[in-house]
């Protein structure tokens, strides 16, 4: 009898446990669903209240090629990112980069063909020097060929310089459109300390770093190209050391300025995140502990609002990064193509016996690295600031 009672009790306990488990799970799922709906509602409410006009205007200014990474409208892109859909796969991204490099190389093809044809003519005329042309005539012909090649290459280098100036300027304008929105959302999340250190840094980036790139680094590129070009006109003209000076000066300034910027950003970001995290947790504890009766509900509502703001902040930051990529990928691809195509032309021209032209092409191709570094530095500085804004407020 006792055994039967124990069995009945155990069966009842098992059924009770199973019932309780499913009952608690249903309640948990319902609560989770309610929380998710509350966060979603809060997210879209925050999104509707944001002033995104400057970002929308910037987005509208993108060309068709630049819109490859950010297809669709600006608001649609933002909502996709909030839902966790980037819209661009890694494979598509890499494919687009190689496509842009190939497109840039094809764009330089007419100029490079011109350089090779003139170099072939110069080599042939040089071979005729002993038979039909006297030395003075040969030098004049070689100088004319070199001048024609120099005109083509310097013209392309000037186009690359203009492209770099425009790209750095567009990155500067994007920071002016994006960071006021991010700083507003950081303030709403309680990131006063992070905003306090990041706000002047945005100003330094917009005015200081881009100014250094435009007024010092890019003129160094111009000086290096001109010195390399003039220094290869004749063996009697030696300007290699001066060309190296311009190139080295631009490189050192870039490394110094961006290293100092990243160091300050790293230290300030860590301190800001720590202080803001303590303040937010203290606010949660204070509301929950000292507000009578409804303190717990207010604290939960506080968390929902913070979660919505955090989602919007991260989505806005990610949108800014995608737009940044769409702006800089094409110019960087074109600069890489410029570098590679000059090296290729130097290799083709070298066996023809016109060493001055080959050396000039190779040296100018090395100067192109300064332009790539200028855009890459501005891009990584922008990326680091967005990353700091995204992680500075722990929610």
Give the label of every model feature segment.
Residues 2-10, 14-118, 123-142, 156-171, ...:
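Gly/Ser-rich, low-complexity
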Residues 334-342, 346-350, 354, 369, ...:
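Membrane-helix cytosolic exit motif
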Residues 140-150, 171-179, 208-214, 245-259, ...:
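Small-residue-enriched core segments of transmembrane alpha-helices in multipass membrane transport
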Residues 198, 205-322:
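Generic multipass alpha-helical transmembrane bundles of integral membrane proteins
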Residues 130-135, 235-250, 349-358:
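Membrane interface segments of multi-pass transport proteins and intramembrane proteases
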Residues 146-159, 177-206, 210-234:
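Intrinsically disordered, low-complexity linker/loop segments enriched in Gly/Pro
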Residues 314-355, 363:
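Helical hairpin unit composed of two closely spaced alpha helices linked by a short loop
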